[in-house]
Amino acid sequence: MALNLRKNHQILKIINDALIDLPAPSNISTWWNFGSLLGICLITQIVTGLLLAMHYTADTSLAFSSVAHMCRDVQFGWLIRNLHANGASFFFICIYLHIGRGLYYGSYLNKETWNVGVLLLLALMATAFVGYVLPWGQMSFWGATVITNLFSAIPYIGQTLVEWAWGGFSVDNPTLTRFFALHFLLPFVIVGLTLVHLTFLHETGSNNPLGIPSDCDKIPFHPYYTIKDILGFVLMLSLLVSLALFAPNLLGDPENFTPANPLVTPPHIKPEWYFLFAYAILRSIPNKLGGVLALAASILVLFLTPLLHTSKLRSMTFRPLSQILFWTLVANVLILTWVGSQPVEHPFIIIGQLASFTYFTIILILFPLAAALENKLLKL
């Protein structure tokens, strides 16, 4: 009998084991679609980004006009740019939902997969930040200035570190050039990390909504979940194309239509919407170093979640107290996002401080306490 090429060819075998014959739990819901959606986001961003890089000029005197030229003179350049800019927003929507799913269903107990996932989030945030600087508009320039300046809060080496990152004494041409180089490089780092993420995931297999082992009831990934994923792709890409065609500037800052000017500071310097929650945490602490530490902690706290799991049940499906806390945390992050977009004045300052305090309290204190209490109530 002839060998089945799909199952025996060195390379096809890897693809087969990851996407076709992969044993998957029979009951995973739509919340498990976001991993593949993130893969589609990554591919879309790399393809559109490559096409944009072919027309972009990484020079302070030409960057802004090269982006304008792309939108005016390049065939479908406006579409490619709008897809790329809004694709970033969809990337973050998907990753935040993906992380939320992981927190709710206890997926973080696959420790290696989770930790690589947090590294992926950090890499994505770095990529988005350096990418936002490239059009060299007002918010690009001042965003870069404000965020890179945070490193100067590091004791002793801070100022040297910032000037080394800038390549001079302010954000200027060398900064733009290196940010373009980093923005080109980092997505490929993300691809590499994604493969590591999947390798670790396929060691243990997917979690499921019940949070119980599903070895006794597995189904092949293809055709069941390939079809389910394709439905997700169609829905997400429809939304992305609709946003890029009907409201391409909805999520952008009007300030970025003005070329960068080091002599004029915009009235409200704020990042893109997907960083606002972290920006609100940064601003809520009146000390520079303290703010930077809180900003870092807001993301790095995710590394601690596997260590803070005190429940005897993996998922929150049967844990009503933890569910209430989880949805409170979601509402809290939305409040932080809103506060981050507001000016630094009363009452936003105190709201931001309370929301920042609540964010860390829920994750570090209330989640473990509620889980321990549920163990008692359920006599586990």
Swiss-Prot record:
- Bilayer-crossing regions: 34-54, 78-99, 114-134, 179-199, 227-247, 289-309, 321-341, 348-368
The membrane topology of this protein is: Multi-pass membrane protein
Show the GO cellular component annotation of the record. mitochondrial inner membrane; respiratory chain complex III
Cofactor details (free text): Binds 2 heme b groups non-covalently.
Matches recorded under Gene3D superfamilies:
Cytochrome Bc1 Complex, Chain C (1.20.810.10)
Q: Which biological process annotations from GO are given for this protein?
A: mitochondrial electron transport, ubiquinol to cytochrome c
Sorted alphabetically, which PROSITE patterns does this protein's record hold?
CYTB_CTER (PS51003), CYTB_NTER (PS51002)
The cofactors required by this protein are:
heme b
* Matches recorded under InterPro entries: Cyt_b/b6_C, Cyt_b/b6_C_sf, Cyt_b/b6_N, Cytb/b6-like_sf, Cytochrome_b, Cytochrome_b_C_euk/bac, Cytochrome_b_N_euk/bac, Di-haem_cyt_TM
What does it do?
Component of the ubiquinol-cytochrome c reductase complex (complex III or cytochrome b-c1 complex) that is part of the mitochondrial respiratory chain. The b-c1 complex mediates electron transfer from ubiquinol to cytochrome c. Contributes to the generation of a proton gradient across the mitochondrial membrane that is then used for ATP synthesis.
- Report the protein name in the record: Cytochrome b
Organism of this sequence = Basileuterus culicivorus
